[in-house]
Design a protein with these regions (language model features):
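Short amphipathic beta-strand starts and helix->beta connectors
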Residues: 33-42, 87-97, 128-130, 176-183, ...
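Acidic, proline/glycine-enriched N-terminal capping motif
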Residues: 1-85, 93-95, 226
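Well-ordered mid-protein domain cores that form the structural environment of catalytic cofactors
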Residues: 73-120, 126-127
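Conserved, structured C-terminal
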Residues: 1-28, 103-360
Length: 360
């Protein structure tokens, strides 16, 4: 049976089309994916992302555990900073991709993908060592994402000036948003300027209403999962189960920047080092023929099948069909011409730089 986020009734009241996703009933759209996508690119959109998982690692060995679990380096983080990192298995495959919030030297908040919450919890607990504790606080937290060029002006109406994080990938905790205690984080999954708000689950619906009211004059609208997916694809952000799996290494997924092979160790480091340079890699494809390449479509060079599409759609802002795919390194150079099999028909495509969209 699917679960409901604390904002379920808000979505129904707003006319959201509810679908099952990652074990939850969530809105796929309200007024339409294209309208919601364009609102985020040009004005602002509000998303309920309360289905995401939140864990706490606390204790004198909290940092040592975070260093061991994740590929990125957390040694020089400041309190109030956020870092993104893959979390790998012993084979170098990706267990999940996670946001790590440093609350202080003995407390870290981990934000994980909803579909991986229980798997991740078991993984982290199984590898915890020393003086460190683990707590899954997901059910007690609501998370809302305010995304788009007008986010700053909307947030300024309801958030005290010292509660607005100034730097990208930073956060402020214990912020009073009209009586609601929040973490305000300058993060997002859309490729736009924006913030994410964390509060107690019971306060989620009230915070939703506060944000929508504050954004009314700017054209803020609620957005669903459909727009969230097209936005992240335009911004070439990988999605677990598509560009990231337990068989794909971070280097193959194009996440080299977040893999610090110079640090002492992390789970999966030995396997990644042993594999050496990746043989296959994530690339962007611009579809030049007629059609849309979807997940699982095969990629060809002539008659040779060389790879597979991991995500694909028609991107509203670009007004063009694009895709991400895993192909051999020999076919990854920008400008390489390939074909994609769409329901038995080959359509032309070309390797292009990622991301497809980058805000000005």
């Amino acid at each position: 049976m699917e679960l409901k986020t604390p904002l379920y009734d808000c979505h129904v009241a707003a006319g959201g089309k509810i679908v099952p996703f990652a074990g939850y009933l969530l809105p796929v759209q309200y007024t339409g994916v294209i309208k919601e996508h364009m609102a985020v690119r040009t004005v602002c959109g509000l998303f309920d992302v309360s289905h995401m998982g939140e864990f706490l690692i606390k204790g004198a060995d909290a940092l040592n555990n975070v260093q061991n679990l994740f590929c990125n380096d957390f040694e020089n983080m400041y309190d109030g900073q956020v870092r993104y990192s893959p979390m790998c298995n012993e084979r170098g495959g990706i267990v999940d991709d996670v946001l790590i919030y440093k609350v202080n030297g003995e407390e870290y908040l981990l934000v994980v993908n909803a579909a991986n919450r229980h798997k991740d919890a078991e993984w982290v607990k199984a590898h915890l060592f020393g003086s460190a504790s683990f707590e899954d606080i997901s059910d007690s937290v609501a998370q809302l994402a305010l995304q788009g060029p007008k986010s700053k002006e909307i947030a300024a109406k309801i958030v005290p000036e010292d509660g607005i994080p100034k730097k990208y990938y930073s956060f402020v905790k214990d912020v009073d948003v009209q009586g609601i205690k929040c973490i305000v984080s300058r993060t997002g999954y859309t490729g736009e300027f924006g913030y994410e708000f964390y509060c107690a689950a019971a306060d989620g619906p009230k915070l939703w209403d506060i944000l929508l009211e504050a954004g009314k004059e700017f054209g803020l609208i609620p957005c669903g999962l459909g727009a969230r997916d097209t936005l992240r694809l335009e911004a070439a952000m990988p999605l677990y189960g598509h560009e990231l799996t337990d068989d794909i290494t971070p280097l193959e997924a194009g996440l080299d920047f977040f893999v610090k092979l110079g640090k002492e160790r992390f789970i999966g480091m030995d396997a990644i080092l042993a594999k050496g340079d990746p043989k296959v890699i994530r690339v962007g494809l611009k579809i030049t023929g007629r059609g849309i390449a979807r997940e699982h479509c095969d990629v060809y060079s002539g008659e040779e099948k060389i790879g597979v599409v991991t995500s694909g759609t028609h991107c509203p802002y670009l007004n063009a069909p694009v895709a991400m795919a895993m192909v051999p390194v020999d076919y990854s150079e920008v400008g390489t011409k390939v074909q994609v099999d769409v329901r038995g028909r080959r359509i032309d495509a070309e390797v292009v730089p990622l991301p497809f969209y980058k805000r000005a």
